[in-house]
A protein has these predicted regions:
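N-terminal beta1-alpha1-beta2 submodule of the flavodoxin-like/Rossmannoid cofactor-binding fold
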Residues: 1-80, 87-89, 94, 98, ...
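Structural signal for conserved beta-strand scaffold positions within catalytic alpha/beta enzyme cores
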Residues: 32, 109, 136-139
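Redox-cofactor binding/interface segments in oxidoreductases and associated redox assembly factors
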Residues: 80-81, 109
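A short helix->loop->beta-strand "cap" motif at the edges of active sites that frequently abuts
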Residues: 103-106, 131-132
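Short beta-alpha junction loops
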Residues: 111-116
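Short, aromatic/basic amphipathic alpha-helical patches
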Residues: 120-129
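Glycine-rich phosphate/pyrophosphate-binding loop and the adjoining helix
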Residues: 133-156
Length: 156
């Protein structure tokens, strides 16, 4: 059993690839945050003001997650990965964090994005994990294993 977990939400598969590599580099277990209702291409159309992803921008929105990590208590560090949607994490990440008591754990956000940085992401996630310590996190687009190793060291 690893002391670290890499949990990730990936709508298109891009975050999944980074999460798998990060888990390998960090020697961490891997958990996919799967929505109870899968996203379609239409759901992800950010140009449509009525698309699901646009409606879920509401900070109070909590999309349901299909499964839980049964052994969260075993981990000291939880890396949480996601795409950046409108400068923050998708609200399903808040749903995931709120499902656990993360007090005393280190939460390390990581993201990928077509052009956004972390922005207000960490500030928006902190209320969902009271008592956890948050690292600054980073956007990990197309990074090398050496960069992932440096990210893990910097997040320790």
């Amino acid at each position: 059993m690893s002391e670290s977990l890499v949990a990730y939400f990936s709508a298109s598969g891009s975050t999944r690839k980074v999460a798998q590599r990060l888990a390998k580099v960090a020697g961490a277990d891997l958990f996919e945050i799967v929505p109870e209702r899968p996203y379609t291409a239409a759901d992800l159309d950010w140009t449509d003001r009525n698309s699901r992803s646009t409606r879920e921008r509401d900070p109070k929105c909590r999309p349901a997650v299909a499964s839980t990590c049964d052994n969260m208590a075993d981990y000291d560090t939880v890396y949480v990965g996601f795409p950046i949607w409108w400068y923050v994490a998708p609200t399903i990440v808040n749903t995931f964090l709120e499902a656990y008591d993360l007090s005393g754990k280190r939460v390390v956000p990581f993201a990928n994005s077509g052009g956004s940085r972390m922005g207000a992401t960490v500030a928006a996630l902190k209320p969902s994990a009271p008592g956890a310590t948050f690292a600054a996190g980073d956007v990990l687009n197309g990074v090398s294993d050496a960069k992932l190793e440096a990210f893990v060291r910097a997040s320790a």
